[in-house]
Amino acid sequence: MWNRRRNQALDGLDDEIRDHIERETEINIARGMSPDEARRQARIAFGSVALVHEDARAAWSWSWVEQAGQDLRFGARILKNSPGLSVTAAVLIALVVGINTTIFSMVNALVTQPAPGVKPEGLVRIAIPERPGAPLVNYSDYLDYREQTTALQSLTAFTNSRVTVASDSGSYAMWTAPVDANFFDTVGVRPVRGRAFTAAEGRSTDTAGLVAVVSYRAWQDVFGGDEDVVGRSIAINSRPATVIGVAPPSFSGTMLNERTDVWLPLLMYLGTLSRETSQRSMTDRNDTPVDVIGRLAPGKSIAAAQADFATMQARLDRSYPTADRPRVAVVQYAATAGGLIPSGAPTLLAIFSVITLMTVVIVSANVANLMLSRAVARQRETAVRQSLGASRIRIVRLLLAEGLSISVVAWLAACLLTIWAARAIPRLLPDSPFGQAGIDFGPDWKVVVYAMVLAAIGTIAFSLAPALRVWRQDALPWLKAGEHSVAPGRSRLSNGLVVLQLAFSVVLLTLAGLATRSVSLMTVDLGFDSQNLLLLTARITGSVTTRESSLALIDRIQERLQVIPGVHRVSYVRSFFPTTQMVRTAGAAEALRATMHVVGPGYFPTMGLSPVAGRPLTIADRERAGAVAMINQNLANALWPGQNPLGKTMSLRMLTFRGESDEQVERVEVVGVTPNAFVGGFNPERPDPRPNLIFISEQRAFGGPGRDPAAPGEITFYLRHGDSDLESVASALGPVLREVDPRVAIVSTQTMDTRLDNVTFSARVIARLLLIFSLISLLIAAIGQYAVIAFNMRRRVREFGVRIALGASARQVLSTVLREAFGLTAVGLLVGLLLSVGVAFAIRGALFGVTPTDGPTYAGVFALLGCVALMACCVPALAATRVNPVQALRQE
């Protein structure tokens, strides 16, 4: 409607202009002028009709909108008229934006994505900054926070544990989340069948009324999707329980890397533990840390909640001054996949930020060269536009419109590439932590905006070079110049862009080389044969009520596994995750940290380890009056340097995240020394990756809270098998365990090699991504170098023709072109070397076994870049030697 009114007004303006000119013409005729002269003088007196139209249009409409539309239509026509260059530029931009957006999408999913099914608005988490990754507050403090808070409308606690769930279909090892009764209301989840926990169930410690909410996946897999699942009886760690609800299919817990299958009331779960553990958990303010999340009250902010918790903490500090109570922080809830993000996440994010910046700069520089070439080809057209009155700003806007048109196409293609990659990553890495966590890497609004920002940066970057050239351009010389005239400034700018691409390619190649070298050096000698070693982790419950029945069950399982065809040796480790002990000797000033493994009979032969001193642990050690252990050479040398450790005694005390535990000190005699071996896997993030190790067996003399062999727990059996027996052995494990005791549940089966590979998974992924980025960047830089050399060669056709006509040989012409090309390469290498050293020193904390100035890495980078530069220069250099002097001299 606005356009129609404006057009009507402009039509009325035309009528008024004609009427004004007609009246002025009549006046001039009355003065004695001829009709033609009278009309001419009237038009002269009125002025430019077109200018009046433009002024009126500017006053009556949004002229900048119309001009922007004209610029965009012009840019679209340019795309259509030169599809080759436009498609090339769009593909390059789409590739770099798509890859970088995919990485950002992964980081976004891992760091900021809420767990599926959770209502994230107003949800906060209570965190402890100085203890990242550790459980948060003790249960007693949580109860006080829940009752006293004024900034949160609800506060709930949860933890996690693995349990054995037995139903009519069998026994299953599942992750359970013991939660407070208001957990589901706080996170905004409603069961699709049945109900959640009541307040009475949340307060009860009576395990006779144990109830459970199961996940949708467990409902389908364990109960076969039974419509009458609510009310069914199951057994959780051999205790009867009743299913009261089924969670929605989208909800499997509050953390991305934790797939919870069973939720239990927290106090009821504590009641299933020993009386001592249960009592300590509910009253000791230095025990039982739990995770705490809450929902802000209406009108309250995170800052208000932080102030509220500071007040409550000060009150608790006065009431319970001896409690270990770290400062807490109220932060926005995010289902961070803690197990998937390495401890050096800030360094890794910084590395990826550098990668993103460099790839965008490399591609933008390459596309800028393409756009600059097109601008040079249209230099006379631009000069004509300037001579006809077009301002420099208007011409620069046209160039920006061309770049924007390319970027819009590239942005759409990049979004499609990101969507495809987000769906492909879990399928391409099904056995990786990323694939197993079930994380949705699909783009959200933040990813889309990120892609738009990258595309906008690229638009400005690659449009800037031709725009600067136009801004400095004088129209008159170009109107007089010939078709092949090119100002020296163009060559300098193009050469500078090539140097920039080469320098950043050197940086990326160096990072990739250092990362690859780090990963290769992580493949150290483990000290034992990891091949043909199958790990079976199982939960033992049911008849495990006494120490004797526990050991009898383990022995029966070991005996049955031993007779599986293809199995050569079998042993076990009591816990898949070993404990950390503080070790002291008589007269020692400081304690040493060591990792302790509780192992079964035959462990060392199964692992292929022989004692270097003393004897191995045997089944007879179970009933000894005093505890005995084997230690590795590393710990023996640290405790008793230059002495014989056999027969000596050491004191052990367990180390927790709060420090040394208050448990009794265990005194253990050393009966053997083992070779140094990474039996728990190689950890490259450990400052001293070669650990101190202690091995003990199932011994009555080694007691203490939490070490009761009768307690339900997990056992990892180590099966040494033949070269071709893996599949047959793995398929026999389930039937064997069911035969021994149907209540024994399999937690996992994996080869030792797979377990070891998972340790370096993040490092290998980073190295591969860096390698891919660097090779793509090098290819783009080589294309850019080829384009510049080829352009310069075409510009100097007359020069080469004159040289050949005057007797220059093909070798001399070839050396001239190659000298120019390798001059660019040398400058790019020098600049890249300086940048690489600086970046390498900045990330040296993420490197393993290599220095930031690693010689083989830099030598390989220089050799690779030199070969690529040579290939990029050969075609235009050889073309220069085949110039026909006669044809070259006839050109304008």
Model-derived segments and spans:
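Negatively charged linear elements and acidic catalytic determinants
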Residues: 1-91, 295-297, 318, 476-489, ...
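Short, strongly hydrophobic transmembrane alpha-helices
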Residues: 83-110, 362-365, 407-411, 494-518, ...
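Membrane-helix entry/capping segments
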Residues: 42-85, 116-117, 129, 170-171, ...
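Alpha-helical transmembrane segments
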Residues: 95-122, 421-430, 504-532, 790, ...
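Alpha-helical transmembrane segments of integral membrane proteins
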Residues: 56-87, 334-341, 371-397, 401, ...
